[in-house]
C-alpha cells in the first residue's frame, strides 16, 4: 500500500509531464561524453564527482539521453532510501514499536516537488549515507565487529565520491563511535581508514592514467563555498519546504516530551540530531541551493516524525495532520495541472530549459574571444 501511494503520486507526473532541466542536461552530457570514450577530468573538464559520473555513464549506455530514464532512476532511489531507512530503524529497535511511519513520511515528503525526481549527485550520495547507518551504530567490543566500522566508513567515502561535501557526514560517524563504540580512538581510526580506502583506490587509478592533477583540482581540492546562494528564489524554496519544516518542528517537540527509554534509543536520537545539523551544514554551504538539496534532511524528518504520529495526542488530530500534509503535497505537486500556480507564484524557470531554443545565427558577423 505504501509503495502504491508513492507510485500513484509520482508516476502520472513523471510519465506525462517531464520538464527538462539544466542540471539534468549537464549530467546527461557528462554521461554521454564518458560513453564516447572520453576520460573524466582529463578530457571532460567538469567538477562532477567520480561516482556520480559513473552512474551517469551507465545510464547513458543503458538509455541514452532520456529524461524519463533519469526520472525513473531517481524515483527508484528515493523509494529504495525510504525502505532501507525504515528497515534499519525497525531492525535496530530505535522505537518502542516497529512500524512503517518513517517510510511513509519519507515518500510523501519526497513527492513534494519535481526536484526530488531529478537524479542529482546529492540524491545518489544520500543512498550511501543511509547504507552507512547500520554499520556506524554497531555496539562494538574489542576484537568483535571491527569490520563493520570499516564498512561504515567505506560507505561514507562512497557518499563523498558522489558529492564531496557529503564528507561532512564523517562527523556523524565520529559521534556514532563516541556514542556506541567501546574503544573510541581505535574505532575512529578504523572508520577513517574505511572512508579513505575508496579514495586511495581512485587516486591510484588517476595517477596511473596521468590524471591525478586534474582530479585534485576539479574534485578533491575544490574550495569550500561559505556563502548562501539560491538557485531558485528563496521565497519559493521557503514555500515548498514549509510543510517539512512544520512537521520537523512538531516532531522535535514530541521527541523532547518522550518518557524514559532504552539507552540505545536515546543515543540513536542524539546521533540523528548530529545528522540533522550535518545536513543543514551541507545544504547551506552549497553554491546552488534549491528544493532538491533538502533531500539530505528527509532521513531526519522521517525519523523524528514517528514521535509525532505515535504521541499521546488524540488519534483524530494526528489523522487530520497527516491528511493535511498529504493534501498539501498533492496540491503543490499538481498545482500546474489544477491551475493554481498563478496564486502560489512559484517560479521554476531558473531550473528549466527554454521550451524554444534560440534561433540559429546565419549570415551574421560574430566575434569569438
Predicted feature descriptions by range:
Residues 72-92:
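Transmembrane-helix motifs of polytopic, lipid-linked glycan transferases
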Residues 67, 103-123, 135:
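Aromatic- and kink-enriched transmembrane "portal" helix at the membrane-lumen/periplasm boundary
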Residues 287-320:
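Hydrophobic/aromatic-rich transmembrane helices and adjacent perimembrane loops
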Residues 50-61, 216-239, 251-254:
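Juxtamembrane membrane-water interface segments that cap and precede transmembrane helices
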Residues 15-30, 43-55:
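Extracytoplasmic catalytic/substrate-binding loops of multi-pass membrane glycan-assembly enzymes
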Residues 130-148:
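Membrane-interface transmembrane helices that cradle and orient dolichyl/undecaprenyl
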Amino acid at each position: 500500500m505504501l509503495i502504491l501511494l508513492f507510485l500513484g503520486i509520482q508516476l502520472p507526473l513523471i510519465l506525462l509531464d517531464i520538464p527538462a532541466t539544466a542540471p539534468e542536461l549537464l549530467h546527461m552530457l557528462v554521461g554521454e561524453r564518458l560513453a564516447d570514450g572520453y576520460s573524466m577530468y582529463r578530457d571532460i573538464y567538469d567538477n562532477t564527482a567520480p561516482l556520480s559520473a559513473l552512474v551517469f555513464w551507465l545510464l547513458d549506455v543503458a538509455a541514452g539521453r532520456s529524461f524519463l530514464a533519469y526520472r525513473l532512476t531517481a524515483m527508484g532511489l528515493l523509494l529504495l532510501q525510504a525502505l532501507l531507512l525504515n528497515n534499519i530503524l525497525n531492525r535496530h529497535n530505535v522505537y518502542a514499536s516497529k512500524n512503517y511511519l518513517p517510510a511513509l513520511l519519507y515518500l510523501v515528503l519526497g513527492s513534494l516537488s519535481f526536484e526530488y525526481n531529478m537524479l542529482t549527485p546529492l540524491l545518489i550520495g544520500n543512498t550511501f549515507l543511509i547504507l552507512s547507518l547500520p554499520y556506524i551504530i554497531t555496539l562494538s567490543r574489542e576484537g568483535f565487529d571491527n569490520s563493520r566500522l570499516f564498512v561504515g566508513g567505506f560507505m561514507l567515502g562512497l557518499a563523498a565520491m558522489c558529492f564531496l561535501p557529503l564528507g561532512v557526514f564523517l562527523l556523524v560517524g565520529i559521534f556514532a563511535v563516541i556514542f556506541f563504540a567501546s574503544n573510541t580512538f581505535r574505532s575512529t581510526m578504523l572508520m577513517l581508514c574505511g572512508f579513505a580506502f575508496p579514495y586511495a583506490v581512485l587516486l591510484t587509478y588517476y595517477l596511473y592514467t596521468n590524471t591525478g592533477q586534474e582530479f585534485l583540482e576539479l574534485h578533491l581540492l575544490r574550495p569550500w563555498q561559505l556563502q548562501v546562494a539560491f538557485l531558485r528564489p528563496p521565497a519559493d524554496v521557503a514555500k515548498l519546504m514549509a510543510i517539512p519544516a512544520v512537521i520537523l518542528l512538531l516532531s522535535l517537540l514530541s521527541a523532547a516530551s518522550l518518557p524514559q527509554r532504552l539507552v540505545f534509543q536515546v543515543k540513536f536520537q542524539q546521533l540523528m540530531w548530529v545528522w540533522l545539523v550535518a545536513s543543514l551544514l551541507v545544504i547551506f554551504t552549497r553554491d546552488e541551493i534549491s528544493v532538491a538539496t533538502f533531500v539530505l534532511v528527509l532521513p531526519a524528518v522521517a525519523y523524528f516524525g514517528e514521535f509525532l504520529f505515535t504521541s499521546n495526542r488524540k488519534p483524530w488530530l494526528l489523522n487530520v495532520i497527516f491528511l493535511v500534509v498529504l493534501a498539501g503535497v498533492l496540491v503543490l505537486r499538481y498545482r500546474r495541472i489544477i491551475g493554481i500556480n498563478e496564486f502560489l507564484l512559484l517560479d521554476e524557470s531558473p531550473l528549466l530549459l527554454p521550451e524554444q531554443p534560440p534561433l540559429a545565427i546565419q549570415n551574421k558577423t560574430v566575434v569569438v574571444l
